[in-house]
Structure formats: structure tokens, C-alpha cells
């Protein structure tokens, strides 16, 4: 099978792709402009089927549908590696958790 045929055989719609997500899973969204809005919307549509799904993003400009559709955080918890302005506002509302990505040595006294 050539690469293009193999690639086409693996293509899925966002709704088909998020069927793989189970309770308790971690899902990683990509960073910034690579944010997957169609996948995010498809995952948000499964809100009532899922519990304790944790999602990590990074510099997402917003909106993040899994956060907006579940302000009680009964189904999804959203974490960010580095806050965009939108994610900082989510943090201020208690709807986003910051994951410390980088630590550097602190000066000794």
C-alpha cells in the first residue's frame, strides 16, 4: 500500500476520533494556532457520556468548548502548559489549571 492510500485509510471525522476517548483519559490538544476546534467541539458533544477526562492545552486563544460546556467540571478538567490571555481568564474563574512546565535553579542565599 502506498503512503497516500494508507493515510486516507486512517482518516476519521472528529466525531469518530473522539469515540476512542474513555472515562479517566488524558487528551492532549496542541499549542496555539494548532488548537483543534472541530475535535474540541466533538469531545464537548460527548460531555454527558464521559467523566474525569483531563485535557491539556497550551496558549489556546479560545473558546475551549469542553470548558465552556462543563463549568461544574463534572466531566472535563482543562490544564494548560502556558496561559494565553483566554486561559488566564479561565484560571481566574477556576476553570483551568496551570501545569508547571519549566523550572530553573533558583539562586542560593
Named regions from a protein language model:
Residues 14-15, 86-87, 104:
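Short, charged beta->alpha transition segments
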Residues 102-109:
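Conserved small/polar residues in nucleotide/adenosyl-binding loops
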Residues 70-100:
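HKD-type phospholipase D/PLD-like phosphodiesterase module
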Residues 2-82:
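N-terminal active-site beta-alpha-beta segment that forms phosphate/nucleotide-binding
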Amino acid at each position: 500500500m502506498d503512503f497516500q492510500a494508507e493515510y486516507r485509510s486512517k482518516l476519521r471525522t472528529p466525531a469518530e476520533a473522539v469515540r476512542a476517548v474513555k472515562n479517566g483519559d488524558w487528551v492532549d490538544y496542541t499549542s496555539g494556532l494548532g488548537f483543534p476546534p472541530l475535535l474540541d467541539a466533538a469531545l464537548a458533544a460527548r460531555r454527558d457520556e464521559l467523566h474525569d477526562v483531563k485535557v491539556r492545552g497550551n496558549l489556546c486563544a479560545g473558546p475551549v468548548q469542553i470548558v465552556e460546556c462543563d463549568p461544574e467540571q463534572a466531566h472535563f478538567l482543562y490544564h494548560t502548559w502556558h496561559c494565553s490571555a483566554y486561559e488566564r481568564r479561565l484560571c481566574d474563574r477556576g476553570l483551568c489549571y496551570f501545569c508547571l512546565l519549566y523550572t530553573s535553579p533558583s539562586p542560593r542565599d
